[in-house]
Amino acid sequence: MYSSGVDSREKLVEAMAELMWERGYSATSPRAVRELSGVGQGSMYHYFPTKRDLGLAALDHNCRVQLDSWKAALKGLEDPLEILSAYLTLPRDPLKGCRVGRMAQDKAVVADDGLREPVAEAFARLREMLVVVIGAARSQGCLPAGLEPDHLARTMVAVVQGGYVLAMAEQDRAPY
């Protein structure tokens, strides 16, 4: 799965991140991570004494990857409405879910503040980006003056995350 130039720690983080995205944190076993990464048990426990330690690194990785993809997709656009539209219509794999949002559905992640906080922080940063754009659209008269940017940003994120939930529940890409 990985090139020889990737170190063992990075292989473990990337494998755990991928498996967490596919299966969730709770359903991802250290053995599955070792098998996917090709890294031995001794090396895994050298870098990550516990599954939680590896999970934290993988959550940080997934949150960073997701935030970077949101930023990259919106980069270069200047019209606020075009930016908002681009966010809503980003290419997604609805049957796989959001790298970040899937973690908010995992009971073990939600029950552990250390695991939950990177997820909450990623959504907060996304909302902050959207609030700036919504504020610009409102200032330019493209959106009603009475519209609350934070409320609309939260609604937009909820709509996208809800689309993932519907797609997975129905095993249908139609919500996108």
Predicted regions and their residues:
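Hydrophobic/aromatic residues within well-ordered alpha-helical segments
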Residues: 8, 51, 58, 62-66, ...
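Hydrophobic alpha-helical segments that form the core
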Residues: 102, 147-166
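Amphipathic alpha-helical segments used for helix-helix packing
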Residues: 83, 94-114
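Helix-turn-helix
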Residues: 5, 11, 15-53, 57
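Hydrophobic alpha-helical connector segments
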Residues: 57, 68-97, 149-156
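All-alpha amphipathic helical-bundle segments outside canonical DNA-binding/catalytic cores
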Residues: 82, 117-122, 139-155, 174-175
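Amphipathic alpha-helical packing segments from all-alpha helical-bundle domains
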Residues: 64-68, 97, 113-139, 151
